[in-house]
Regions:
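Short, hydrophobic-biased segments on the C-terminal half of alpha helices
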Residues: 45-52
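Short, amphipathic alpha-helical interaction segments positioned at domain boundaries
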Residues: 72-93
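N-terminal positioning helix adjacent to the helix-turn-helix/winged-helix DNA-binding module
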Residues: 2-6, 40
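Hydrophobic residues on short alpha-helical segments
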Residues: 7-14
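Short, Lys/Arg-rich nucleic-acid/phosphate-binding segment
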Residues: 61-72
């Protein structure tokens, strides 16, 4: 399968799994992107924020985790689902 740009892979992942935190997103993508320089929490967080800014993702929950870190959960929006049509055919179910 063709490797997607990480932003689109995050979007695709959230079309398959709901209410994921950044840590859960990173755990799901570690095998594909774990060796890349962009696979850092700060960079992935900026990707998520940019997808939220254009309306492709939304925050579904905000809470403090066990380490007292502010944590958000994310879902894909209807608009984001509509953008999946631009993925390579092998990524579209």
């Amino acid at each position: 399968m063709t490797k997607l740009p990480m932003k689109f892979r995050i979007l695709h992942l959230l079309s398959k799994k709901e209410n994921l935190t950044i840590h859960e997103i990173m755990n799901n993508l570690r095998d594909e992107y774990g060796t890349e320089g962009q696979f850092k929490k700060t960079i992935i967080s900026s990707y998520i924020q940019s997808l939220k800014a254009v309306g492709m993702l939304e925050t579904t929950d905000v809470y403090f985790d066990d380490n007292n870190e502010l944590t958000e959960k994310y879902n894909i929006t209807e608009y984001g689902l509509g953008r999946l049509k631009y993925l390579p055919k092998e990524w579209i179910d």
